[in-house]
């Protein structure tokens, strides 16, 4: 059976760190920022690390070979 391919959309959205954690951009920034608090906007600026349960699902389904 051939190797499972990495999903192209996942390559653009997720980055795997050296320790195996998965970094993603913070959600909720596409529109409607005018009514958000300054703290929300500031916190959503950077990236975040997925929890272990979500990271396991992402690796299993979308990034079988890593990046």
From Swiss-Prot:
Family matches, as NCBIfam families: rpmI_bact
Organism placement in taxonomy: Bacteria, Pseudomonadati, Pseudomonadota, Alphaproteobacteria, Hyphomicrobiales
InterPro entries in UniProt: Ribosomal_bL35, Ribosomal_bL35-like, Ribosomal_bL35_CS, Ribosomal_bL35_sf
Gene3D superfamilies the UniProt entry points to: 4.10.410.60
Biological process (GO), any one: translation
The protein, known as: Large ribosomal subunit protein bL35
PROSITE patterns cross-referenced by the UniProt entry: RIBOSOMAL_L35
GO annotations of cellular component type: cytosolic large ribosomal subunit
Domain of life: Bacteria
Keywords recorded for this protein, A-Z: Ribonucleoprotein, Ribosomal protein
Gene expressing this chain: rpmI
One Gene Ontology term of the molecular function aspect: structural constituent of ribosome
Pfam families: Ribosomal_L35p (PF01632)
UniProt family annotation: Belongs to the bacterial ribosomal protein bL35 family.
């Amino acid at each position: 059976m051939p190797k499972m391919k990495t999903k192209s959309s996942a390559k653009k959205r997720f980055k795997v760190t050296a320790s195996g954690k998965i970094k993603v951009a913070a959600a909720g920034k596409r529109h409607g920022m005018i009514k958000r608090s300054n703290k929300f906007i500031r916190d959503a600026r950077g990236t975040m690390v997925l929890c272990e349960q979500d990271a396991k699902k992402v690796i299993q389904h979308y990034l079988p070979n890593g990046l």
